[in-house]
């Protein structure tokens, strides 16, 4: 039996988190696989009573985090803190003997066939795509070819499996990638040129010889604002 750890740092609105868990409950698990959940609760103790069917640890949060009605507000310190929290989830996967680590940010609503499609892809590192509309109306996704966010393509709106340069937020990684030393540790000689822990992870993975891919058969839904959550609950 192959083991999958579904995991994420957790700092989220209760209602969004409940919708997130509902989507996890609907996931189709392939035959021969089993899935468990693990969260690192990051300064939002109010959500703890609502966690179900999951293990969790609680960490103190000394960094102020906020978001507007349009976007998250990220500082460099918050990004590196997020990297530390993601490393905590990797350690849980390694220590728990898991074969796959599936990181799913807690504002994402997964399609029921997400795990099935990611397992079928059979890649060391593969994400499932989701698209987000920025305040300026432009759409961006959680995969790109190079640098900060260059090389997104409309081709990825077609169902398929595509090689990419970088990805994150909704990503399945095989155990051997972590055993090779790939992590979310900050690369000390790359600073503002590549902002964000996902980018540093992808650079480390590429340097270790691993390819990165994105699957587009079952896009997730990104509820990163209250308005988007209300639209989702209204069935739009």
Question: Model-found features: residue ranges?
Answer:
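Active-site beta-to-alpha loop of glycosyltransferases that engages the nucleotide-sugar donor
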Residues: 3, 8-22, 43
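Cell-envelope/extracellular polymer assembly enzymes that use nucleotide-activated donors
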Residues: 3-7, 36, 200
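Short, acidic, metal-binding catalytic loop of nucleotide-sugar glycosyltransferases
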Residues: 19-34
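Active-site-proximal specificity loops/subdomain of glycosyltransferases
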Residues: 45-98
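Conserved catalytic core of nucleotide-sugar-dependent glycosyltransferases
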Residues: 90, 108-187
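Short beta-strand-to-loop acidic/aromatic patch adjacent to the donor-nucleotide binding site
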Residues: 97-109
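Short, high-confidence coil segments that cap the C-terminus of an alpha-helix
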Residues: 98-99, 123, 210
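C-terminal catalytic/acceptor-binding lobe
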Residues: 165-170, 175-236
